[in-house]
């Protein structure tokens, strides 16, 4: 029997507000344990939550970016459960009226086609703390993360393969990153993914029993975990077994999934309205204000790059991978840079430099203005493409004018025949054996003179002009 794969994803995105959702503590990542906490985070008796308006702003932006409807009257709920990293014994979340609902995004499949994935809801909530189990037999609680604002984005079960799930996550990450509400760094926990997967016989309308996957710390592991579950569940069903509703974690070392617990349902959490927070009214003016702050998103930019700038689909995809890279490209083009040349530099030398340095483009000194000027002095013959690589490294580390640096460092390309011809004659005089080989008709003897000339000019001879003049002067030797 063959089965159809049904996948839905729950993505937790940590919002990059300065303070937490209900307390004034810093929400920044990487501090010493419990450094970013106060009495609200520790749930001291009598303390009350105070809503961070910036979190609602971010929620509205996310809902708009994901083509969602927005609840104009929004409230919070208590999700009750006990765990050491949750000192209140409940989490403030949203249950029946999330900030956003009925959304969708479009993903691009491996064959080049597109598919619309529906999004059921996006709700705001507070993050829990973190438990660390030490080798000394003790467990430690760090509440720095307690109260950090999250938006949970829940897709419909519209994905039919691990590859589609991977494409959905890639598209979702791009969109959220473009809004500026999160840096979506999985390695820092600001984007976390849970996957729900079930199988059903082809032709059956009813979904099968789903399994939830956790501990998916990379998009690659999401795909691997789902691929393993497809095989595990299919094998179990074909042998007459029954799929239980359970939570499993992906074990990267063993490339498989391991049972964590039997899955709870909503009733287990005993949701009820949060009594310490009011109803929040989101009017059209507020929504319009947030909409005005949104940028053009990756799909629209890719279409523009292909249709208006003549770039390939691959180039357009690479350039829109992050908003900062896309903004850099667009600024450079707006300053007169040739789109293809700018694209080549961003994907070539610049990308290699960034990878080697472990930096992003906003962390180096190169500006779009610097890059456009450098491309211009390559085009007008001031420097060669080879010399430009050296110039770029200087600009990346120090910034400044490309032309000014080239002139100060004595890197201006020599293109004047009146300067080059005497140097060529001196090369002939200094290399009599090579001249003799050339005159005797020795094969490829002329090739050596290019190297001699570049050495004599310290690499500053214009390669095209040098080759032309060498050919002329060598012909005179032959004659």
From Swiss-Prot:
GO MF: asparaginyl-tRNA synthase (glutamine-hydrolyzing) activity; ATP binding; glutaminyl-tRNA synthase (glutamine-hydrolyzing) activity
Gene Ontology annotations of biological process type: glutaminyl-tRNAGln biosynthesis via transamidation; translation
Name assigned to this protein: Aspartyl/glutamyl-tRNA(Asn/Gln) amidotransferase subunit B
Catalytic activity: L-glutamyl-tRNA(Gln) + L-glutamine + ATP + H2O = L-glutaminyl-tRNA(Gln) + L-glutamate + ADP + phosphate + H(+); L-aspartyl-tRNA(Asn) + L-glutamine + ATP + H2O = L-asparaginyl-tRNA(Asn) + L-glutamate + ADP + phosphate + 2 H(+)
Lineage: superkingdom: Bacteria
Listed NCBIfam families: gatB (TIGR00133), PRK05477.1-1 (NF004011), PRK05477.1-2 (NF004012), PRK05477.1-4 (NF004014)
Keyword ATP-binding in annotation: yes
Job of this protein: Allows the formation of correctly charged Asn-tRNA(Asn) or Gln-tRNA(Gln) through the transamidation of misacylated Asp-tRNA(Asn) or Glu-tRNA(Gln) in organisms which lack either or both of asparaginyl-tRNA or glutaminyl-tRNA synthetases. The reaction takes place in the presence of glutamine and ATP through an activated phospho-Asp-tRNA(Asn) or phospho-Glu-tRNA(Gln).
Family in the record: Belongs to the GatB/GatE family. GatB subfamily.
EC number: 6.3.5.-
Record's subunit section: Heterotrimer of A, B and C subunits.
Swiss-Prot/TrEMBL keywords: ATP-binding, Ligase, Nucleotide-binding, Protein biosynthesis
InterPro entries for the chain: Asn/Gln-tRNA_amidoTrfase_suB/E, Asn/Gln-tRNA_Trfase_suB/E_cat, Asn/Gln_amidotransferase, Asn/Gln_tRNA_amidoTrase-B-like, GatB, GatB_C_1, GatB_Yqey_C_2, Gln-tRNA_amidoTrfase_suB_CS
């Amino acid at each position: 029997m063959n089965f159809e794969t049904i996948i839905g994803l729950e993505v937790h995105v940590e919002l990059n507000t300065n303070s937490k959702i209900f307390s004034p503590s810093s929400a920044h990542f990487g501090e010493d344990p419990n450094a970013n906490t106060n009495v609200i985070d520790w749930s001291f008796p009598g303390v009350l939550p105070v809503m961070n308006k910036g979190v609602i702003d971010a929620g509205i932006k996310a809902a708009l970016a994901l083509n969602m409807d927005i609840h104009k009257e929004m409230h919070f709920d208590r999700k009750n459960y006990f765990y050491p990293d949750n000192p209140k014994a409940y989490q403030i979340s949203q249950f029946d009226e999330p900030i956003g609902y009925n959304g969708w995004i479009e993903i691009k499949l491996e064959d080049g086609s597109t598919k619309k994935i529906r999004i059921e809801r996006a709700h705001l909530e507070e993050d829990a703390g973190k438990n660390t189990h030490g080798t000394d037999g003790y467990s430690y609680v760090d509440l720095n993360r307690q109260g950090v604002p999250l938006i949970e984005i829940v897709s419909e079960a519209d994905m039919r393969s691990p590859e589609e799930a991977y494409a959905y996550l890639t598209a979702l990450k791009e969109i959220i990153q473009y809004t500026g509400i999160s840096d979506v760094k999985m390695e820092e926990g600001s984007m976390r993914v849970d996957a729900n997967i079930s199988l059903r016989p082809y032709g059956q309308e009813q979904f099968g029993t789903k399994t939830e996957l956790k501990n998916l710390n990379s998009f690659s592991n999401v795909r691997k975990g789902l691929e393993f579950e497809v095989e595990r569940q299919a094998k179990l069903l074909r042998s007459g077994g029954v799929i239980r509703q359970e939570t499993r974690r992906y074990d990267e070392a063993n490339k498989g999934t391991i049972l964590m617990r039997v899955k709870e349902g909503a009733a287990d959490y005993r949701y009820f309205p949060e009594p310490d927070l009011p109803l929040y009214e989101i009017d059209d003016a507020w929504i319009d204000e947030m909409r005005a702050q949104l940028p053009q998103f990756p799909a629209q930019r890719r279409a523009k790059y292909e249709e208006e700038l003549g770039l390939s689909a691959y180039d357009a995809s690479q350039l829109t991978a992050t908003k900062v890279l896309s903004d850099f490209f667009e600024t450079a083009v707006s300053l007169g840079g040739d789109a293809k040349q700018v694209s080549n530099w961003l994907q070539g030398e610049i990308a290699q430099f960034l990878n080697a340095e472990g930096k992003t483009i906003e962390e180096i000194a190169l500006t779009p203005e610097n890059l456009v000027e450098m491309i211009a002095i390559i085009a007008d013959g001031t420097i060669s493409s080879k010399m430009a690589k050296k110039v770029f490294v200087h600009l990346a580390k120090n910034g400044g004018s490309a032309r000014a640096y080239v002139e100060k460092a004595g890197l201006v390309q020599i293109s004047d025949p009146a300067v080059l011809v005497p140097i060529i004659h001196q090369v002939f005089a200094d290399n009599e054996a090579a001249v003799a080989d050339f005159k005797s008709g020795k094969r490829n003897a002329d090739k050596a003179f290019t190297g001699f000339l570049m050495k004599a000019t310290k690499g500053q001879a214009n390669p095209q002009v040098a080759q032309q003049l060498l050919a002329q002067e060598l012909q005179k030797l032959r004659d």
